Amino acid sequence: MQFFIIGTDTNVGKTIVSSWLCLHTAYDYFKMIQTGSINGTDSDILKKLTYSKIHKEAYCYKEPLSPHLAAKLEQDEININNIILPNASNLVIEGAGGLLVPINQQYLLLDIISYLMLPVILVTHSRLGTINHTLLTLQALKSKGIEVVGVIVNGKPNQDNCDAITWYGKTTILAQFPFLSTITKTTLRNIPLTQELKQLFIV
């Protein structure tokens, strides 16, 4: 299976959740578009936290900006026809920023996901505002006919928020991923996959 991991925003925990999933499932990892490489890449993080095969990014830019701006600074433009998925049966693909982040002058990240038509796992935060952010993202995905297999909520557990997202978003909470003060292979390994995730990833 191949799953697209996207977030309701930047810095909601896509990379840590991707690391957790890859560590437990041995899935390959592919960061489609990387910005901010001057500060290190998400692929570098996966190399430290997992044993997975890491595939080279389709596009990688230095500045931590929206992909269309980061590319422009380097006199480049992202061509979605050049984004070719790795030949891997079991693959976690991580998006860049939020769903409506511009990729170039024509396309948003949503358009790429719609073109690929892969099932999506949505990562969101547990703090105030998550219900609105998550429901808007779910609505945008569903408007394009994209399959959302469920939501992973990252941060301090908040069952009320999870219940609201489940009810109004007509979706499934696949896991509540806890806040970790230290992130290592060991701390990630100590958080077991939920039964829902085991069934999805067939582990």
Curated annotation (Swiss-Prot):
- Residues the record lists as binding substrate: 35
Q: Which GO terms describe its biological process?
A: biotin biosynthetic process
Task: State its Enzyme Commission number(s).
Answer: 6.3.3.3
A GO cellular-component term linked to this record: cytosol
The subunit field of the Swiss-Prot or TrEMBL record says: Homodimer.
Q: Give the protein family.
A: Belongs to the dethiobiotin synthetase family.
Its function, per the record, reads:
Catalyzes a mechanistically unusual reaction, the ATP-dependent insertion of CO2 between the N7 and N8 nitrogen atoms of 7,8-diaminopelargonic acid (DAPA, also called 7,8-diammoniononanoate) to form a ureido ring.
Q: What is this protein called?
A: ATP-dependent dethiobiotin synthetase BioD
Lineage in the entry?
Bacteria, Pseudomonadati, Thermodesulfobacteriota, Desulfovibrionia, Desulfovibrionales
Coding gene? Answer: bioD
